[in-house]
């Protein structure tokens, strides 16, 4: 059982990663293997809309990890896509990554019927709009959406602030438990 967690932040160890680390603890306690994909530190190109991927199953842009992610996604059991909030939407980096990963995934077969969870981290507001943006990818790819005991969000400007958001951290733990449960149920048939 494996979940892939995508950190859509430019900061490898910022507030978004703080939220994911809280989830990872729960996944490990639930005996779910984790793999973190860090989008920070490298450029992510936007989709060229050339449609070559619809014939080849791969994006023509080969140097930013999207094709590698799609290959790994085919064997994953669930996904978490996490983002910092910029002006009430996910990071452009994450949007570019999702556009290309979902479109080039050959009819979305890498994601179909696999549960997904969106996570948004912000200093203050805009999280629900950001979550809506990510959840749209799940809907079009026929992915069940995992929820928690509150919206999947954490508040804080820096990692230590985010870790002090008790309700946000509890929401992340509950979200991880719910996603692990969904993956196990689907695997059991």
Question: Language-model segments: what does each one mean?
Answer:
Residues 2-32:
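N-terminal beta1-alpha1 ligand-phosphate binding loop
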Residues 4, 24, 28-30, 62-68, ...:
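Glycine-rich phosphate/pyrophosphate-binding loop and the adjoining helix
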Residues 7-8, 12-17, 45-54, 77:
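Cysteine-centered iron-sulfur cluster-binding motifs in ferredoxin-type domains/subunits
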Residues 35-38, 147:
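A structural preference for short, hydrophobic beta-strand core positions in alpha/beta folds
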Residues 58-150:
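Helix-loop-strand module that forms the ligand-binding subsite of alpha/beta enzymes
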């Amino acid at each position: 059982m494996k979940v892939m967690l995508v950190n859509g932040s430019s900061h490898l160890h910022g507030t978004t990663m703080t939220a994911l680390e809280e989830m990872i603890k729960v996944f490990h306690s639930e005996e779910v293997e984790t793999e973190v994909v860090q989008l920070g530190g490298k450029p992510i190109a936007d989709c060229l809309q050339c449609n070559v991927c619809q014939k080849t199953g791969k994006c023509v842009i080969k140097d930013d990890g999207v094709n590698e992610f799609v290959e790994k996604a085919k064997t994953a059991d669930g996904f978490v896509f996490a983002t910092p909030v910029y002006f009430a939407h996910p990071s452009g980096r994450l949007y570019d990554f999702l556009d290309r990963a979902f479109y080039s995934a050959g009819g979305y077969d890498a994601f179909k019927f696999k549960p997904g969870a969106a996570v948004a981290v912000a200093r203050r507001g805009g999280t629900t709009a950001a979550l809506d943006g990510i959840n749209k990818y799940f809907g079009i790819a026929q992915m069940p959406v995992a929820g928690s005991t509150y919206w999947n969000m954490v508040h804080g400007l820096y990692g230590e602030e985010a870790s002090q958001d008790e309700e946000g951290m509890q929401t992340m733990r509950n979200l991880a438990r719910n996603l692990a449960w969904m993956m196990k149920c689907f695997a059991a048939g």
